[in-house]
Amino acid sequence: MFFDTIKNIATNILQTKNLKEKYIFFDFFLFFCAFFCIIITRYQFCLCIQVFLQLLHTIKLIKTIYKGKNLVMKKLNILYYSLPMVCLIALMAVASLYDLQISKALADLDLGQYYSPNFFGRLFEVIGELPVYLLCGFSLCIFSVWVYLKTKQPQIATTYKGKTKTDTSKQMEKKTKVAYIILACFLLVVATAFYWVAFFKMIRYILRLHNLTTNAWLYLSQVLAAVLLCYTSVSILLAMKQQTINTLVWFAIITLATSALTNALVQGLKPIFSRLRYRAMSATYDSTFAGFTNWYQRNPNNTLTTAQTNAGLSSDIFKSFPSGHTAGAASVLSLLSLPYLFKQNKVTKILLYVLCPLYIVVVAFARIVMGAHFLSDVTMAMLIGYICYLVILTVTMHIKHKYTLKQNTNL
């Protein structure tokens, strides 16, 4: 009977032509699924479902308000943003019941081990977070080049009541150019810092997994690699047309805003829940996994025990929920905004829509294999990243549309 009801609701959604009625049917469908999730999880999932539905409803309202005003918003159909969200919520429901069992089945760890010897898991522990730093660094390079190119634009002489600009105004223009150049250089320094953090974290994970120590040469090589990557990024951007750079600025805004919001939420939730990692229980020979808590429960025992201290563990073991690696990998979702900014062929679009989510899923799976996170940890990180991306994309594209209309009006 449950599946017949689902089928009838889905049929009504597809057959309804009126947008408002379709939203009503869709809301009812989501609430029905939420009610089912609440029942199977004994009401413990209720609060989370309500929050997610409210966020989804907000996104739908934004789309309704700007429908017809923004051509991009017409492409954001219901299935585009709702289907992945519903799937992730369903995964959270599954994780609420079988989180520990799934980790026991997938984690490649023996009792007493903290770092898994699994090559797949180790590989993505090293490179999993790289996208957030590389994309943010490249976005700052875009801003730097955009600011620098403004100083190269020809100055147009203006008149007011038959009088041209005075020498004083020309001197002000020179000061403005200097300020722009200083700003461009500052952005390059910050971009280089992001690139350096990417290499630093990658090397740190490698050293940690192999129980090695760093040295001055490694630090120097990281700095040189970051400078070289920044130089390459700027060289590529300077070879592009001014119009392309202007469009890439919107991509940079989406990338930086999405990454900042996602990681701020994820890092803010970690100390609130203080969830113990699966591999921390394995390292202390806790075969009963007595330290396990469900994702919706706060861990009251968030201080290191004697056994954990003797095992060489740190307070990082209490940062399981949500997954930082998965949140960092979720920054690749900003690449999905490129089809809205540039005209691209179908092959490129398909590659973006397949490879970006696939990378996030692979990183999430690798974190479970390493015993660093549970299914609910990585799923929540994906959900937060996806919601943040949709909200930032919607707002940014609306602002871009208004800005474009204003520019065309001034012409």
Q: Could you say what each language-model-derived stretch is?
A:
Residues 51-72:
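Short, Lys/Arg-enriched N-terminal segments with co-localized hydrophobic residues
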Residues 2, 24-40, 47, 51-55:
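Hydrophobic alpha-helical signal peptides and transmembrane signal-/tail-anchor segments
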Residues 132-146, 222-235, 330-334, 383-396:
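Hydrophobic cores of alpha-helical transmembrane segments in multi-pass inner/ER membrane proteins
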Residues 96, 142-157, 232-243, 337-343, ...:
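Structural signal for the C-terminal ends of transmembrane alpha-helices
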Residues 74-85, 296-411:
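Membrane-embedded catalytic cores of phosphoryl/pyrophosphoryl-handling enzymes
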Residues 260-291:
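Transmembrane alpha-helix/helix-exit interface in multi-pass inner-membrane proteins
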Residues 240-271:
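Interfacial segments of alpha-helical transmembrane regions
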Residues 68-144, 155-226, 272-278:
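N-terminal transmembrane-helix/juxtamembrane module of multi-pass inner/ER membrane proteins
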